[in-house]
A protein has these predicted regions:
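Glycan-binding loop/region signatures in secreted carbohydrate-active enzymes
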Residues: 96-99, 103-110, 256-326, 346, ...
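Conserved, mostly hydrophobic/aromatic
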Residues: 52, 95, 143, 173, ...
């Protein structure tokens, strides 16, 4: 039933949209990318991931002038993650940069918006990234600027120039890193959009030649009473199919797209309770006020009820398996998940993600 759904509903649609001929090349080696945060309480199992993005490093921009960047949190956590390469020499580890500021010795002085507006500062940042990769034996850089042209978390933005400067930043990073290092970015579920004051988000067509992968954040696309990461949903603001279709229409190769998997339930975007991570879901299953692992056939996603009312949606092994077959059928590059520490003690979701990308679907 799943296979019929994938082939008839999704693959046929995207075949018509793909400008370079659908599925001419479906890579055999899929990516399973874990985001591992500086504040997390566990490490990924290096034998069930191919890539780790360490989150985060932050920019030090003082009065609009880029000075340097530093890891967020304690360096000891970063060292623990880097040491995982000893257990799996094939493991790739990249450093992810955020637009936010959390270090006590830093403040929001312009961030990506100011840094990317200057050719000199862009090149200095790119050179600093290369030096850091060489120092720590890192495999690449991931840019999580959320988002050009928007001001979230109090960071600076300029809708008139951010989108253009983002492209120039990625160009300078690729020139500095060369082809020996991975370059990726956290992608919104749609292309750049026009606003009254300029543009927001990323110019996908302009940026894609410079990057190896796009980590498409196919989660938080809606909140209760709708689904946050549905494959298809007639009621949610956006869904996985719409996101992948948006990128395919722009000519992005499927193998550069990574599908985002949330390790948490999304209840709301504001209020006292916004998310419930998977390890907490496991504990709440004994609470008689909650019902978990209810299934929506259209969305292909589990959801929960609280006292009989829709509470939120999330991913579980069943939905991850569906997405895994979907990834293989389309020839996507693989998946990413946010974030490792939200899994339960048995690493149930991490194992499901690994199974989803390593299973032989041709048997």
């Amino acid at each position: 039933m799943i296979k019929n759904f994938v082939l008839s509903t999704f693959v046929v649609v995207l075949t018509a949209l793909c400008p370079f001929g659908a599925f001419a090349s479906q890579p055999q080696n899929k990516i399973c990318r874990a985001y591992c945060t500086y504040y997390g309480d566990k490490l990924p199992d290096p034998n069930i991931v191919t890539h780790i993005n360490y989150a985060f490093a932050e920019l030090y921009v003082v009065d609009g002038v880029y000075k340097t960047f530093k890891l967020q949190g304690n360096e000891s956590r970063f060292r623990q993650v880097m040491a995982l390469k000893k257990q799996n020499p094939n493991l790739k580890i990249c450093l992810a940069f955020t637009h936010t500021v959390s270090n006590s010795d830093n403040r929001q002085g312009g961030g990506f918006s100011k840094m990317s507006a200057s050719p000199e500062m862009r090149k200095q940042f790119a050179a600093d990234c290369l030096a850091f990769c060489k120092k720590w034996n890192l495999d690449g850089i991931d840019i999580d600027w959320e988002f050009p042209g928007l001001s979230w978390s109090g960071h600076a933005s300029d809708p008139k120039t951010d989108t253009k400067n983002y492209t120039l930043l990625m160009k300078d990073l690729r020139e500095a890193l060369g082809n020996d290092y991975i370059l990726s970015f956290a992608g919104y579920v749609m292309d750049m959009q026009s606003t009254d004051s300029g543009k927001k988000y990323v110019d996908i067509q302009a940026v894609v030649p410079y990057v190896d992968y796009i980590n498409i954040m196919t989660y938080d696309m809606d909140a209760a009473p709708h689904f946050q990461s549905a494959i298809i949903s007639s009621t949610s603001y956006y869904d996985c199919m719409s996101a992948i279709r948006s990128y395919a229409k722009l000519g992005v190769p499927f193998e550069k797209m990574l599908l985002g998997i949330p390790f948490y339930l999304r209840h709301s975007h504001d209020g006292l309770t916004t998310v419930v991570d998977y390890k907490q879901i496991v504990k709440l299953k004994s609470n008689p006020n909650f019902e978990f692992d209810l299934w929506d056939e259209e969305a292909r996603t589990p959801y929960a009820k609280y006292k009989g009312k829709f509470y939120g949606s999330y991913d579980n092994p069943r939905s991850i398996a569906v997405k895994g077959e979907w990834i293989h059928s389309l020839g996507l590059g693989g998946l990413l998940y946010w974030e490792n520490s939200e899994d339960d003690a048995d690493m149930t979701l991490a194992k499901a993600c690994w199974e989803a990308i390593t299973k032989n679907y041709d048997e």
